Amino acid sequence: MSTNKLAVLNALDTARTQWYHVTAIVIAGMGFFTDAYDLFCISTVSKLLGRLYYYDPANPKHNPGKLPTPINNFVIGVALVGTLTGQLFFGWLGDKLGRKKVYGITLILMVICAICSGLSFGSSARSVIGTLCFFRFWLGFGIGGDYPLSATIMSEYANKKTRGAFIAAVFAMQGVGIIFAGLVSMILSKIFLQLFPAPAFEDDEIFSTQPEGDYLWRIVLMLGALPALTTYYWRMKMPETGPASDMGRVLDIEIDEEHDKLSQFKEVNKYPLLSREFFQRHGLHLIGTMSTWFLLDIAFYSQNLTQKDIFPAMGLVHKAPQVNALREVFETSRAMFVVALLGTFPGYWFTVFLIEKIGRFIIQLVGFFMMSLFMLIIGIKYDYLKNDNKWLFATLYGLTFFFANFGPNSTTFVLPAELFPTRVRSTCHALSAAAGKAGAMIGAFVVQSYTLDEDSKKIQHAVLVLAFTNMLGFCCTFLVTETKGRSLEEISGEDGGVGYYHDTEMSSRPTGARQSGRMEAI
């Protein structure tokens, strides 16, 4: 660290972990819990929607009702379109108006649209699905705002020794949300099964689809509003990271504003986002964060959104004609829950505990490589694994989830919150996250089209393409740099050699006064 660094820029860098750090992790993390639940719970009930609204008794193949491919892709993918637009809009707004002012808006949108998604009524299948897609777009819009705002707020609260772990801990709540998406659907479908038993489709095509299932999918979607609703009050109580008056109020300290030095600091660092100086300093990093997140989400969302179609090949669920509608929801949800609990969830927390020891760069590099390796094995040996070794298939498949989360799914969220200057940090994180959601849309609208009919050759080709995609992510990781153990200003070059830093002055200050510095600098 430069010895002439502004005293105010020590902000949170040398501070010990305090209670408000933990509070911020929980509050921001509950947003990601809600995000993950809302985005992934639809996969547990999408086949039920097909049985309820698209069963054709005149179908000569005598198959259960199934959402047509374009409609299935849109039902599952429309929230991702909303997420992409929400990331760009709220990321920009967070830099213009401040993080706190728009942080509550995203939560309100998520609550209202989660409830309205479950109230999607109509006189025809088309009107029900159309209304559902409308509200899920705006649900995704609110979810999108949470990505840049939560990451930016957490990075600006934390000290440099724990910053990566804190941001990763917020993001790790996504894993808990995915688990609960499977768990809630599993519990509710089991209750409905006990109350409304029915024969398998192959035994009775009509009565195998319980009409009460129409309540099940609505309840599953509406429950996504609860965690967001419970944290709204606390989110509004969080201090703004920008104005020092808020942080001073929280920490009960008086702030040394150092106005002259701050004026010099701001003069040096006021170049805009769309400028030659920005691209000279940060252009490669922005390309790196956008490309790696884009490539990662093609694979990650393809896995998560299409796993319901791969579960039969792994022997984790029965084929559709062998079960009734509610039983299919139960088996799909149970399989999602098991994969998330054993594969997805541990990966997030390995990252939290090791990110400050190993570093972001190595975790991301190894994660991409291992994902590519396991998918390559699955793709090459698909027929053998499907027919002769389903447990090995399930293990390899679970390991791809583990290394996605103990790997690029976590680090692509952390790095954009650290690499860029304060005044454009939220916008740059939003651009990176939006690139990721563009990749997720490829997973939802393109890859899912290959897996929907459960054709072995198509699934095999899709997995091999994803293996190649992960290897491209491995290569693009070299465009970013390690941020472990460095302050945000040092990483982004914001200190710029302006001002000076007195060890004795800082050591004589109360801890809270040192912590408040970055808030004033911002």
Where are these regions (language model features)?
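Transmembrane-helix signature of 12-pass secondary carriers
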Residues: M1-I522
